[in-house]
Amino acid sequence: MTHQTHTIAESNNFIVLDKYIKAEPTGDSYQSESDLERELIQDLRNQGYEFISVKSQSAMLANVREQLQNLNGVVFNDSEWRRFTEQYLDNPSDGILDKTRKIHIDYICDFIFDDERLENIYLIDKKNLMRNKVQIIQQFEQAGSHANRYDVTILVNGLPLVQIELKKRGVAIREAFNQIHRYSKESFNSENSLFKYLQLFVISNGTDTRYFANTTKRDKNSFDFTMNWAKSDNTLIKDLKDFTATCFQKHTLLNVLVNYSVFDSSQTLLVMRPYQIAATERILWKIKSSFTAKNWSKPESGGYIWHTTGSGKTLTSFKAARLATELDFIDKVFFVVDRKDLDYQTMKEYQRFSPDSVNGSENTAGLKRNLDKDDNKIIVTTIQKLNNLMKAESDLPVYNQQVVFIFDECHRSQFGEAQKNLKKKFKRYYQFGFTGTPIFPENALGSETTASVFGRELHSYVITDAIRDEKVLKFKVDYNDVRPQFKSLETETDEKKLSAAENQQAFLHPMRIQEITQYILNNFRQKTHRTFPGSKGFNAMLAVSSVDAAKAYYATFKRLQEEAANKSATYKPLRIATIFSFAANEEQNAIGEISDETFDTSAMDSSAKEFLDAAIREYNSHFKTNFSTDSNGFQNYYRDLAQRVKNQDIDLLIVVGMFLTGFDAPTLNTLFVDKNLRYHGLMQAFSRTNRIYDATKTFGNIVTFRDLERSTIDAITLFGDKNTKNVVLEKSYTEYMEGFTDAATGEAKRGFMTVVSELEQRFPDPTSIESEKEKKDFVKLFGEYLRAENILQNYDEFATLKALQQIDLSDPVAVEKFKAEHYVDDEKFAELQTIRLPADRKIQDYRSAYNDIRDWQRREKEAEKKEKSTTDWDDVVFEVDLLKSQEINLDYILGLIFEHNRQNKGKGEMIEEVKRLIRSSLGNRAKEGLVVDFIQQTNLDDLPDKASIIDAFFTFAQREQQREAEALIKEENLNEDAAKRYIRTSLKREYATENGTELNETLPKLSPLNPQYKTKKQAVFQKIVSFIEKFKGVGGKI
């Protein structure tokens, strides 16, 4: 990377390197897990780590004592050390979050020694990182619910902060991830475990190495949140040898642990990704080098960061702002956002990262007051407030101070008047912009581009990088044009023609709006993965071109849903909300910019305002809220709505401009578009859908009711490169059905139909899979089926194919209805009939077999029969997320019992059908006996409807739960009160754990030293685990 300014020594200290030459492979011979471990330890020792042998908690504590004494220049006597340990270092009541807080926030302890002198005892020296002692231990054994051996642990000042889990080359890396997951449940967090201090996990199979934060947050625990290390050009560093030579350099690792991790106020530990660190480092380097050269207030003294939407810009900009405040020559850091709503969101986000370091300002006077305070160096403000302040105040002390400006999404009104004022008023500033969509000459409306205002690009991480690293998802774009009479209108791209009044009216033709609304209602559940009873799936947004369009759609949805509810008592309407306001006629800075809607509703015309009032009243009556269109009430409505979209309380949100930029909701997977989008606006709007969430969310679904194909390709080419189209856009339906070659990797991917036919040929009867090799082959093949089906269910063509399986082909009325609903002509209909999908029953049987093998494999593993096995299961990953997404809930199963009974099917046949269903469901397998007993012991004819069956089942299950709990307590001779308390807690959290003391308190009086104690504890624990699996979700008293 060439830098134009004076280079200072600091620039060579980047931890994300510009250059790195890969290590040569040391040999081609087979490398076992222990070989890999030996090599890693040797490499770390060569890099200056000290290897020590520590095998017990007490030895680990003794080492911590020695390291902290050296670091702090003190000596503890035994009673002082005991006091320090019990009160602070390893307080028995500390959980994992308390320990993390001690590394990030409370890392200095004011300790009073026996002779009454007070000393600051540091756990870690954050000012001078290289003073911290780094050591390694291996194969430390920790007792917990299961004794676990940890591969390699890195200690900092004696405390275990990094855990490395290795698997031999060729093993699926997810295996190592799952193992860490198991440890954190079983023993990292057992009482008095210093392993609660762990900050960072590193997993590797030699070929692929990833790191991730130790967090208890379930959504951040997914494998998708693991990351590779990388160079500054985003080339990944995957091999363990290369990872060790770069990320495990002592200076680098300590920086990641201390400077590039954040423990936020929602108590989530976040560790930054390499591109976030690289950008932050380069901003700090630029500020320092410009200051040294006295070269401020010019484009050369700043720069911009191009990081794609959804890649975590807020965390990066926060860290850059936070670390800039620590430079002693900087007086203030302004974090400037563009809109009122973003101001609030950024304040919330910033406060999440660090509650004390941010001053928001309600208005310009508030901003002025904040400038006078010395205690906080970071100020969050909007460009509008900053501009008003500069216009109103000709002389402020801050104008002559050393100031850093960081602009979030730096491409809007900052280009205008505010920039001129800023350059006039501030004498010594360094200005940086973050953007996901820079303005280049190609998409600029005037002469100004991102680079001409902010200076050169300091770091980039574009959408192709993010998709390759699986940090954002691809887009699947449907150009939906099934309305022949509106075709010429929907394919028009000439802006002048589009804005002509008669065309605007034609877009709002009631027939067109009704057809599109009906399409959305028909396809909503399929697009948002809600086709299975009880599945939560995702939610969606509809972006429309004007306030009139929003009104028309909202009213049409309401009418069509009311009509459907009148026809069917079981119809469940979608929960729909809308928000829009007045968009001031501001000049655009770039082609395709989404015009900015303000929170000022007073400028709206009266009919739009009345309509919005009515929509908000409906929202209020549903959610028991009290919002309105007056300015404060409207702002609060915006905030409440944003939260409810994130929580999935809203199914579909209709918007004009708001929420299409800067709004982040990982549960949103579909955007319906009836407006013309281009360049920046298109990328911003599409990016609402492509946040990673879990394995069921494979891409962002975009369904456009106008022809945006050319605009889409133009936008992704501008913000990526010429090959971006192949990376950013999902493959076609035909490619997934028939197979394709991946352009990026050159790998041939089999089509869905090939997988189906192999499945049916090799495993016609899933109940007869006997040998271990057959089991493994089946699991791999059915896993491939689940992954392909999960992707295909987003395609309309696949939904049509599945719908065809459900109709009676001998019924001409049903056939004609099907053709009309799915826009299928005779030729297409004949073609569809040639494609055969496996019957639903067959898939249920396959799912049961898959679940059975998973259970069997877990039992085998626990019994450690693996030693004798000749089949290597290491490269098999069970697709648990995909199974869960198609869960069938208990209410559905009970409804089925009611239907079967009404059709006078015998109990024997009914029980077989119910067993098949339950076994194919991951969450309800343990309830099989309970449901079967219920059928056998209940006179179903006495129950008149579905609701009574559900009530009767829960009454029955609660009675059984009570009876079995008492029997278990008696049989195992447990302490009754403690056992009931422990069972109640476990039922509430839906799993049993051996962490903490709750389980021990239930056991009969036996000394923990008695050899039978451990056996007894294990036996009781296993029985309670089965009990919880069987009765969770049943309710009732214990």
UniProtKB/Swiss-Prot annotation:
GO MF entry, a single one: DNA binding
Catalytic reactions on record: Endonucleolytic cleavage of DNA to give random double-stranded fragments with terminal 5'-phosphates, ATP is simultaneously hydrolyzed
Family assignment from sequence similarity: Belongs to the HsdR family.
Enzyme Commission number(s) from the entry: 3.1.21.3
Protein name: Type I restriction enzyme EcoR124I/EcoR124II endonuclease subunit
Miscellaneous comment as given in the Swiss-Prot or TrEMBL entry: Type I restriction and modification enzymes are complex, multifunctional systems which require ATP, S-adenosyl methionine and magnesium as cofactors and, in addition to their endonucleolytic and methylase activities, are potent DNA-dependent ATPases.
Helicase ATP-binding domain location: 294-439
Domain free text: The individual domains assume different positions in the enzyme, allowing the holoenzyme to regulate the methylase, endonuclease and translocation states. Deletion of the linkers between the domains prevents movement and thus restriction activity.
Location of the region described as Motor 2-helicase linker in the Swiss-Prot/TrEMBL record: 720-732
Region (C-terminal domain): 886-1038
UniProt keyword Hydrolase, yes or no: yes
Function summary: The restriction (R) subunit of a type I restriction enzyme that recognizes 5'-GAAN(6)RTCG-3' (for EcoR124I) and 5'-GAAN(7)RTCG-3' (for EcoR124II) and cleaves a random distance away. Subunit R is required for both nuclease and ATPase activities, but not for modification. After locating an unmethylated recognition site, the enzyme complex serves as a molecular motor that translocates DNA in an ATP-dependent manner until a collision occurs that triggers cleavage. The enzyme undergoes major structural changes to bring the motor domains into contact with DNA, allowing DNA translocation.
Motif DEAH box per UniProt: ranges: 408-411
UniProt: ATP binding residues: H307, T308, T309, G310, S311, G312, K313, T314
Keyword Nucleotide-binding in annotation: yes
Ranges for region Nuclease domain: 31-249
BP term (GO), one: DNA restriction-modification system
Region (Motor 1 domain): 250-469
Annotated stretches, region: Motor 2 domain: 470-702
Subunit structure: A monomer in solution. The type I restriction/modification system is composed of three polypeptides R, M and S; the restriction enzyme has stoichiometry R(2)M(2)S(1) while the methyltransferase is M(2)S(1). There is an equilibrium between R(2)M(2)S(1) and R(1)M(2)S(1); the latter is methylation and translocation proficient but restriction deficient.
Sorted UniProt keywords: ATP-binding, DNA-binding, Endonuclease, Hydrolase, Nuclease, Nucleotide-binding, Plasmid, Restriction system
Ranges where the record places region Helicase-CTD linker: 859-886
Helicase domain as annotated region, ranges: 732-860
Gene expressing this chain: hsdR
Native source organism of the sequence: Escherichia coli
